[in-house]
């Protein structure tokens, strides 16, 4: 079945939120954020071409300090392939997607709001993941000693069947 208007609106909202973060990063002064926050803001982005169905999202991996992920992220480099795996048995969110390395190492989860927008489309066969890769990574070893977790962003390219 086709994507519903509600599903499409939900998707467009999430794409717009990611893109707004990127635009904000370009337009606000450096003193607007705590040091270090600006570059992360700029790492988010999103676009959806309704004519072609091409979806591109740059989003932050969540939960990087749990499940031994901090250690796995030390081994990850920009451009590394990411496997986006549907995780419907997740006790916290049945819409979850896990982010794994090519070797199957767990490097986090897609943000919940994105999962909630994408999972119904994915489950109905209306979203096909084309490629996913690490677009930005800062392992905890490279961050300030006050940092509690690694930072990792993923570039996801997908096709939406209208």
Residues of each region from the PLM?
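Conserved active-site motif detector
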Residues: 1-162
């Amino acid at each position: 079945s086709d994507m519903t208007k509600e599903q499409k609106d939900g998707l467009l909202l999430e794409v717009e939120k990611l893109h707004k973060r990127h635009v904000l990063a370009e337009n606000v002064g450096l003193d607007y954020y705590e040091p270090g926050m600006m570059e992360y803001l700029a790492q988010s982005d999103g676009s959806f071409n309704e004519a072609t169905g091409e979806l591109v999202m740059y989003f932050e991996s969540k939960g990087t300090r749990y499940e031994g992920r901090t250690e796995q992220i030390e081994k990850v480099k920009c451009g590394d392939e990411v496997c986006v795996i549907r995780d419907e048995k997740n006790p916290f969110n049945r819409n979850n997607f896990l982010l794994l390395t090519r070797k199957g190492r767990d490097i986090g989860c897609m943000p919940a709001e994105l999962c909630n927008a994408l999972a119904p489309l994915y489950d109905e066969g209306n979203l096909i993941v084309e490629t996913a890769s690490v677009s930005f990574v800062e392992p905890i070893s490279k961050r300030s000693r006050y940092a509690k977790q690694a930072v990792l962003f993923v570039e996801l390219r997908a096709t939406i069947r209208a």
